[in-house]
């Protein structure tokens, strides 16, 4: 988790189900005026989003930011590519880790911190179906144990 995280606007719960998150980092987002207004109104969808490193820059793709209702001519295309702001060393590290290793960059959540839109970006490795079933099984077992412990403690 990012330190001092502000108001969470959107989360990508599907990413934690489909991927094993290895590392996370906070990135700034380059947005236009109407886009930041839509983000503050929580009109953003991270479900199919991904990021990739191209020419020393990190770009966010397939993230839908709904057009601002009162934006008229200033509205941008809802699923356009958006640049992410990171330090050069972070970008080089991400490029190294994603190149040919089966790792990908997945947006985990968007939040407002000190007036700026921030994105929690996860370095992730895809899960197989049997891994997903295993994690669901483990979660249900933990839930059952907690339920039994609660019943024992209430007696």
Curated annotation (Swiss-Prot):
Q: Which GO terms describe its biological process?
A: trans-translation
Q: What is its main location?
A: cytoplasm
Q: Return the SUPFAM superfamilies for the record.
A: Small protein B (SmpB)
NADP found in the keyword field: no
* Keyword Transcription annotated: no
What UniProt keywords apply to this chain's record, in alphabetical order?
Answer: Cytoplasm, RNA-binding
Any one GO CC term of the record = cytosol
Where found in the cell? Cytoplasm
Which InterPro entries does this entry report, sorted A to Z?
SmpB, SsrA-bd_prot, SsrA-bd_prot_CS
Molecular functions (GO terms): RNA binding
Which residues does UniProt assign to the signal peptide? none
| Known function | Required for rescue of stalled ribosomes mediated by trans-translation. Binds to transfer-messenger RNA (tmRNA), required for stable association of tmRNA with ribosomes. tmRNA and SmpB together mimic tRNA shape, replacing the anticodon stem-loop with SmpB. tmRNA is encoded by the ssrA gene; the 2 termini fold to resemble tRNA(Ala) and it encodes a 'tag peptide', a short internal open reading frame. During trans-translation Ala-aminoacylated tmRNA acts like a tRNA, entering the A-site of stalled ribosomes, displacing the stalled mRNA.
**Which family does the UniProt entry place this protein in?**
Belongs to the SmpB family.
Q: What HAMAP family would the database entry show? A: SmpB
This protein is called SsrA-binding protein
Source species, please?
Answer: Streptococcus pneumoniae (strain 70585)
This chain is encoded by the gene named: smpB
